[in-house]
Swiss-Prot record:
It is a single-pass type I membrane protein. It is found in: Cell membrane; Cell projection, Cilium; Golgi apparatus. Changing residue 731 to F: No effect on autophosphorylation and phosphorylation of PLCG1. Abolishes activation of phosphatidylinositol 3-kinase. Glycans are attached at residues 42, 76, 103, 179, 353, 359, 458, 468. Belongs to the protein kinase superfamily. Tyr protein kinase family. CSF-1/PDGF receptor subfamily. It comes from Homo sapiens. SUPFAM superfamilies: Immunoglobulin (SSF48726), Protein kinase-like (PK-like) (SSF56112). The gene is PDGFRA. Its main location: membrane. It is linked to A chromosomal aberration involving PDGFRA is found in some cases of hypereosinophilic syndrome. Interstitial chromosomal deletion del(4)(q12q12) causes the fusion of FIP1L1 and PDGFRA (FIP1L1-PDGFRA). Mutations that cause overexpression and/or constitutive activation of PDGFRA may be a cause of hypereosinophilic syndrome. InterPro entries: Ig-like_dom (IPR007110), Ig-like_dom_sf (IPR036179), Ig-like_fold (IPR013783), Ig_I-set (IPR013098), Ig_sub (IPR003599), Ig_sub2 (IPR003598), Kinase-like_dom_sf (IPR011009), PDGFRA (IPR027290). ATP binds at residues 599-607, 627. Residues 550-1089 are cytoplasmic. This is Platelet-derived growth factor receptor alpha. Changing residue 572 to F: Abolishes interaction with SRC-family members and impairs internalization of the activated receptor.
Length: 1089
């Protein structure tokens, strides 16, 4: 029966052609022809397969386990192919599905199509078919059913499925196992054979994410490489873990590639497959393909990328324009160049072989990356100009290649005429007109002529000048590619004619005209033109001189006096000095004054040493200082000097100010006669005595002090009459005039009767405590005894006297505005006197003064409110007093050493910067400075309190000695005091006294009242110190104005007759000075106002 089936099959196949076709499509046949068969343990069995082509078997065991399985082919007369499978000794391992199939139908992707039979081999000791270890891992897709393959060797054996929770209900098929939907975890199959229980090892169910479609992405970091570089390609699968991926690439056969897998689970599942090909060569060029297949389903996806490998880098330049380009003037145009290059190139532009300097608004370049190896560079002309013409070159270069492309750019410019001139041919009367024009393209030149000058405004009067006209020659030639010159020559011009040059090109035209004048008229025009030019030059010169004259700084008195203040405190009325009365008692006869050498000279005036005869009864001959203006002084400066005189008469006398002695205001230049101060200004005195001070204070070593700006070693060779240093100009240059300019001064012999000078020795250390001192020691502070040199107590004495002098000015509502050591003089007896020395100081060349508009300001001495808000008060003078203290205790140093007056200086002052303690100041003195430098003016001490503070630092007897000297001064017949009295009726400033003693007592009592009212605290906005104002008339700066009538030149001396009248007295006075050991030459060299 087993052999009849093939015979019938063959016979059926031969019946008709249709049957034959069906036969080709039919499956092979298996004998026995059953779906399943049970075979006894250890018995043998055989299976035969018949087919029309070659057939093969597929069975449960692997080739390693199939030693007792034999397969052979048999011949068959019917033409069929027969394959026999024989098992000699059946065991439980032989249980499974046996399949016969055609060889040509075997593929890797699909299941075999053939005939099947399932064989059972029951074994009482083996309930379940043996499995490989991988079979115990059950992979389940999301929520899909799965099979746990616990197959039995006997189809009749009952089986149950268990997990950690117990029996799991599921359908069971002895050929497959349990089929169902299982959660993740271990499962065990349990069977009972003849009362004996069998269990499998655990089946582990594992769930993998899988989708019905594959999301595959392929990426290559680069698609172009050079030999030797590493190719890297990646493929990524998203949201699927059951994937099989295969690479296909040129180097696959050689196994050159290295593959890696990376699983990324955050934020979603991603499998990244990386292919790396090191040391790439040209042969590695080609398609790189990755194919992904889902392991549990028939889902496939494929991606590919083309990689090219070059032997070395390359550059290709493809411009989108020609080598000659034109652009219209003011046109916007872009020039684009395409570049292919690897490695990435550096792209630059050149103009005329020079690196192109981009103008932010007119020409720019940029580079844009289009693709991996494609770039686009643009040259942008925003508004083309004529100078943009030239040769432009783009250069692209990398490590392996350099390529460039050059094109010429022409900016097309409308025609313009550069020049139109006529050349004369002398007496022959011939004239040539030259017309130079430029433009791109090169313009054509056309000549036109108008013979009737009066009608040349009408275009019809102009005719084109032909080339071949008798006595007229035209020619044209080009200078370069954009400039052309045309000429027309007239053999003779007998009358005035007009000639027009017309230059034109494609972009525009321009014309220009000139007149040709006959030679007879030309000479007349030349003379008229010369006169006109000369007149213009004269007018311009006058304007320049007027401007220079107006910009020249003018002399202005610094002192100001308040007349009244508004109730709200915001408006101030100042005393107009010109409105003050001038008491004729101050007038001094000119013939009683003999002028000597110049002590100080400035931009506006000078101070001259003089001898006055008859100023006081006790001193018929007195050495004085005379202020005067220069002969070139303007009326406003004469008015300012007169204002200064009236203010001095208004203030009255004080020991610590330079007192007025008299004045000459009539029949000549204005002279102001003041006290003569023997030792000169305080700065010079401190410099001169610095070595003696340092010798008395060994803890203050002699070192080079930067604040002085000089070398102490050179002091022996320096003249102290010069107040400015040549190197830095810190102090005024007191230029000495020629000694023959004035009659030499005759000195007096007697000492001052109002300065009671006692000499005694004293010496105090730099750091000291207040102690009681002998009267003689105290008096030494107010004496001319220099045997002990300059001491610290001398510095404190100077400090105290300046405070008393400023206290007096404050009591008179007078603001100084220029308090500094250069404006403090030292008289005999070491008496300090405050003055305003601006007239005789060359402030325009003095570094201490900074130009602000038409004035100069001592910025380093000024308070912040004066610098920034133009506010001047007694409290701003307190700030300057603190700077003066710094000068004194640094022995004449310049404030803020090493700092220039600039924006940095102003910012530091605003931010609260203050100078450090000078080397020779005690902590108590420095504390005074700091109080004076408070940024809030109202928190600064008054001069009254400053006097008391400094007084406490001096010996106890000092004040008594000082007050005695001051009182003696007020009782004396000193001219400054005497002229305040009226001899006829013993009245003093409008108050009548019965006798001299009552007057003096009232004066002494008034001193304390005067001190208590010293701190006025007024805030005085003075408009003439605005940092940047234009120069204004003096009358605009005050509430009232007046004009002085004193305008005259300075006389250079007094009459000889006057000198002869005083000769006897003068000789006697000189003898007296010799007796006290005063050298008259020293007085001239070391003294000034």
């Amino acid at each position: 029966m087993g052999t009849s089936h093939p015979a019938f099959l063959v016979l059926g196949c031969l019946l008709t052609g249709l049957s034959l076709i069906l036969c080709q499509l039919s499956l092979p046949s298996i004998l026995p022809n059953e779906n399943e068969k049970v075979v006894q343990l250890n018995s043998s069995f055989s299976l035969r397969c018949f087919g029309e082509s070659e057939v093969s078997w597929q069975y449960p065991m692997s080739e390693e386990e199939s030693s007792d399985v034999e397969i052979r082919n048999e011949e068959n007369n019917s033409g069929l192919f027969v394959t026999v499978l024989e098992v000699s000794s059946a065991s439980a391992a032989h249980t499974g599905l046996y399949t016969c199939y055609y060889n040509h139908t075997q593929t890797e992707e699909n299941e075999l199509e053939g005939r099947h039979i399932y064989i059972y081999v029951p074994d009482p000791d083996v309930a379940f078919v043996p499995l490989g270890m991988t079979d115990y891992l059950v992979i389940v897709e999301d929520d899909d059913s799965a099979i746990i393959p616990c197959r039995t060797t006997d189809p009749e054996t009952p089986v149950t499925l268990h997990n950690s929770e117990g029996v799991v209900p599921a359908s069971y098929d002895s050929r497959q196992g349990f089929n169902g939907t299982f959660t993740v975890g271990p499962y065990i199959c349990e069977a009972t054979v003849k009362g004996k229980k069998f269990q499998t090892i655990p089946f582990n169910v594992y769930a993998l994410k899988a989708t019905s479609e594959l999301d595959l992405e392929m990426e290559a970091l680069k698609t172009v490489y050079k030999s030797g570089e590493t190719i890297v390609v990646t493929c990524a699968v998203f949201n699927n873990e059951v994937v099989d991926l295969q690479w296909t690439y040129p180097g696959e056969v050689k196994g050159k590639g290295i593959t890696m897998l990376e699983e990324i689970k955050v934020p979603s599942i991603k499998l990244v497959y990386t292919l790396t090909v090191p040391e790439a060569t040209v042969k590695d060029s080609g398609d790189y393909e990755c194919a992904a297949r889902q392991a549990t389903r028939e889902v496939k996806e494929m991606k590919k990328v083309t990689i090219s490998v070059h032997e070395k880098g390359f550059i290709e330049i493809k411009p989108t324009f020609s080598q000659l380009e034109a652009v219209n003037l003011h046109e916007v145009k872009h020039f684009v160049v395409e570049v292919r290059a690897y490695p990435p190139p550096r792209i630059s532009w050149l103009k005329n072989n020079l690196t192109l300097i981009e103008n932010l608004t007119e020409i720019t370049t940029d580079v844009e990356k289009i693709q991996e190896i494609r770039y686009r560079s643009k040259l942008k002309l925003i508004r083309a100009k004529e100078e943009d013409s030239g040769h432009y070159t783009i250069v692209a270069q990398n490590e392996d290649a350099v390529k460039s492309y050059t094109f010429e750019l022409l900016t097309q410019v409308p025609s313009s005429i550069l020049d139109l001139v006529d050349d004369h041919h002398g007496s022959t009367g011939g004239q040539t007109v030259r017309c130079t024009a430029e433009g791109t393209p090169l313009p054509d030149i056309e000549w036109m002529i108008c013979k009737d000058i009066k009608k040349c405004n009408n275009e019809t009067s102009w005719t084109i000048l032909a080339n071949n006209v008798s006595n007229i020659i035209t020619e044209i030639h080009s200078r370069d590619r954009s400039t052309v010159e045309g000429r027309v020559t007239f053999a003779k011009v007998e009358e005035t004619i007009a000639v027009r040059c017309l230059a034109k090109n494609l972009l525009g035209a321009e014309n220009r005209e000139l007149k040709l004048v006959a030679p007879t008229l030309r000479s007349e025009l030349t003379v008229a033109a010369a006169v006109l030019v000369l007149l213009v030059i004269v007018i311009i010169s006058l304007i320049v001189l007027v401007v220079i004259w107006k910009q020249k700084p003018r002399y202005e008195i610094r002192w100001r006096v308040i007349e009244s203040i508004s109730p709200d405190g915001h408006e101030y009325i100042y005393v107009d000095p010109m409105q003050l009365p001038y008491d004729s008692r101050w007038e001094f006869p000119r013939d009683g004054l003999v002028l000597g050498r110049v002590l100080g000279s400035g931009a506006f005036g000078k101070v001259v040493e003089g001898t006055a005869y008859g100023l006081s009864r006790s001193q018929p001959v007195m050495k004085v200082a005379v202020k005067m203006l220069k002969p070139t002084a303007r009326s406003s400066e004469k008015q300012a000097l007169m204002s200064e005189l009236k203010i001095m008469t208004h203030l009255g006398p004080h020991l610590n100010i330079v007192n007025l002695l008299g004045a000459c205001t009539k029949s000549g230049p204005i002279y102001i006669i003041t006290e003569y101060c023997f030792y000169g200004d305080l700065v010079n005195y401190l410099h001169k005595n610095r070595d003696s001070f340092l010798s008395h204070h060994p803890e203050k070593p002699k070192k080079e002090l930067d604040i002085f700006g000089l070398n102490p070693a050179d002091e022996s060779t320096r003249s102290y009459v010069i107040l400015s240093f040549e190197n830095n100009g810190d102090y005024m240059d007191m230029k000495q005039a020629d000694t023959t300019q004035y009659v030499p001064m005759l000195e007096r012999k007697e000492v001052s009767k109002y300065s009671d000078i006692q000499r005694s020795l004293y010496d105090r250390p730099a750091s000291y405590k207040k102690k009681s001192m002998l009267d003689s020691e105290v008096k030494n502070l107010l004496s001319d005894d220099n045997s002990e040199g300059l001491t610290l107590l001398d510095l404190l004495s100077f400090t105290y006297q300046v405070a008393r002098g400023m206290e007096f000015l404050a009591s008179k509502n007078c603001v100084h505005r220029d308090l500094a050591a250069r404006n403090v003089l030292l008289a005999q007896g070491k008496i300090v006197k405050i003055c305003d020395f601006g007239l005789a100081r060359d402030i325009m060349h003095d570094s201490n003064y900074v130009s602000k508009g038409s004035t100069f300001l001592p910025v380093k001495w000024m308070a912040p409110e004066s610098i920034f808000d133009n506010l001047y008060t007694t409290l701003s003078d307190v700030w300057s007093y603190g700077i003066l203290l710094w000068e004194i205790f640094s022995l004449g140093g310049t404030p803020y050493p090493g700092m220039m007056v600039d924006s940095t200086f102003y910012n530091k002052i605003k931010s609260g910067y203050r100078m450090a303690k000078p080397d020779h100041a005690t902590s108590e003195v420095y504390e005074i400075m700091v109080k004076c430098w408070n940024s809030e003016p109202e928190k600064r001490p008054s001069f009254y309190h400053l006097s008391e503070i400094v007084e406490n630092l001096l010996p106890g007897q000092y004040k008594k000695s000082y007050e005695k000297i001051h009182l003696d001064f007020l009782k004396s017949d000193h001219p400054a005091v005497a002229r305040m009295r009226v001899d006829s009726d013993n009245a003093y400033i409008g108050v009548t006294y019965k006798n001299e003693e009552d007057k003096l007592k009232d004066w002494e009592g008034g001193l304390d009242e005067q001190r208590l009212s010293a701190d006025s605290g007024y805030i005085i906005p003075l408009p003439d110190i605005d940092p940047v104002p234009e120069e204004e008339d003096l009358g605009k700066r005050n509430r009232h104005s007046s004009q002085t009538s004193e305008e005259s030149a300075i006389e250079t001396g007094s009459s000889s007759s006057t000198f002869i009248k005083r000769e006897d007295e003068t000789i006697e006075d000189i003898d007296m000075m010799d007796d006290i050991g005063i050298d008259s030459s020293d007085l001239v060299e070391d003294s000034f106002l």
